[in-house]
């Protein structure tokens, strides 16, 4: 039985992951924590996520749960997730991280820390989106330079980072397939008299509003035709179930940094 703790257990993703862990065979909820001062701290976990009593209280620090768990699932913020990985790696505990907004230097540190423990980091853990990553790469390679690539993403009004980690990954996949460097060709906003679109641009545009769970459209626009590939998430359960699948997988792996393509056997 895999024993799991959930970071940010009172949040939208954290609470749903915790709920689904309790419904999934082979894994049990063994802890949950929030940042110091959060109103959920010291409350029974079931008061936060619902269901029958767990016998566990929400703690205020990852260190308070590490001794009793095998893996930590973390959908918080990039800086918090990196600090949690520092502590988990020092104690030999696996991690699954779905936080987005990592800077390059943060990802570089995460890769070094993953030399001590197995860790899955992915901006999106749904099966559909990970298939989308592969499809976009394949389509970009097939169409080549004659089609322009544009990515549009939409999320709920409370999402803090933009563009989404998924949109950035889609852009990176397309850029890689076309032999481009996203840092050089990515365009994140257009306004005013900007002139003609350059041939190498990859556009990434952001929408925020309402309670949109997540929507990503990748457009390949050519002369006289275009292809649009769309993924719409209708529930956070897709992400939560993917994270649990990753947790069950990662505890059996050697130290290293993995993605959902590894978990799903796509790489």
Curated annotation (Swiss-Prot):
It is found in: Cytoplasm. Pathway: Amino-acid biosynthesis; L-lysine biosynthesis via DAP pathway; (S)-tetrahydrodipicolinate from L-aspartate: step 4/4. GO terms for molecular function: 4-hydroxy-tetrahydrodipicolinate reductase; NAD binding; NADP binding; oxidoreductase activity, acting on CH or CH2 groups, NAD or NADP as acceptor. It comes from the Bacteria. The keyword Lipoprotein does not apply. PANTHER family: 4-HYDROXY-TETRAHYDRODIPICOLINATE REDUCTASE 1, CHLOROPLASTIC-RELATED, DIHYDRODIPICOLINATE REDUCTASE. This is 4-hydroxy-tetrahydrodipicolinate reductase. It comes from Syntrophobacter fumaroxidans (strain DSM 10017 / MPOB). The lineage of its organism: Bacteria, Pseudomonadati, Thermodesulfobacteriota, Syntrophobacteria, Syntrophobacterales. The gene is dapB.
């Amino acid at each position: 039985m895999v024993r799991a703790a959930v970071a940010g257990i009172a949040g939208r993703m954290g609470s749903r992951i915790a709920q689904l862990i309790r419904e999934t065979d082979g894994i049990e909820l063994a802890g949950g924590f929030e940042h110091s001062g959060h109103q959920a701290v010291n409350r029974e976990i079931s008061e936060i996520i619902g269901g029958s009593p767990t016998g566990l209280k929400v703690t205020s620090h990852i260190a308070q749960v590490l001794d009793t768990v095998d893996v930590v699932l973390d959908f918080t913020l990039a800086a918090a997730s990196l600090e949690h990985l520092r502590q988990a790696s020092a104690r030999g505990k696996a991690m699954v991280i779905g936080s987005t907004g990592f800077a390059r230097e943060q990802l570089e540190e995460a890769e070094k820390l993953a030399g001590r423990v197995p860790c899955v980091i992915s901006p999106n853990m749904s099966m559909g989106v990970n298939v989308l990553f592969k499809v976009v790469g394949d389509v970009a390679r097939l169409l080549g330079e004659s089609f322009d690539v544009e990515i549009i993403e939409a999320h709920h009004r409370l999402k803090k980072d933009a563009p989404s980690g998924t949109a950035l990954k889609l852009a990176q996949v397309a850029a890689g397939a076309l032999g481009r460097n996203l840092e050089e060709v990515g365009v994140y906003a257009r306004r005013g008299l900007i002139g003609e679109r350059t041939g190498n641009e990859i556009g990434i545009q952001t929408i925020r509003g309402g309670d949109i769970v997540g929507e990503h459209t990748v457009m390949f626009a050519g002369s006289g035709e275009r292809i649009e590939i769309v993924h719409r998430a209708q529930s956070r359960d897709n992400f939560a179930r993917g994270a649990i699948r990753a947790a069950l997988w990662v505890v059996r792996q050697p130290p290293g940094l993995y993605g959902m393509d590894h978990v799903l056997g796509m790489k």
